[in-house]
Amino acid sequence: MTLIKFLLTALAGIALGFMITTRVLDRRLSFDTAQAGPWRGQPKSGTMDIDPYANARIARTAELPLGSAEGLSFIARNDSAGAPLRPDCDYIVSGGVPPTRYWTLTLISPKGFLIDNKAKRFGFTSAEVVRAADGTFTIVVARTARSGNWLPVGDARAYALMLRLYDTLLDFGTTKVGADALPKITRGGCA
């Protein structure tokens, strides 16, 4: 009888552990997340110090994180006011980025894939974005075409924005990064 209780308890513990781990991975939760405004990053993703849940998520999704010497990657699922990004709304991504050799801003699905659109524009890079005289930029994320830097949403039902900074001086380990260090995401009109 004691052996049966032990086995049932062990099986219940394994099942509960599996359910909790699956839930953490599905919700993309992590324990080493750094945040600057709406942007969330995992500065330890490309290092030996990565937390086990982030490591499992990367193995599960076949994601290729940037190494610590390569740069940092950030994802925004909310605007700067904290509201979730909605595909029926226009957003203005504006400001600048910290000193970096190269950066990219990409529209991705909730699972991290590029979102197809008729314009075949999936993102912007620091080499091609049109900037203001002070070096800042404005990118409009919207379903319908806009003049200037326009990033089309396509037929996406949900999306996120990914900002990658390559060869950057930004270091979450030694520096407190404020919300103004990365671009702001402001909601415009909604359909």
Regions found by a protein language model. Give the residues of each.
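A compositional/structural signature for long, glycine/proline-rich flexible linkers
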Residues: 1-191
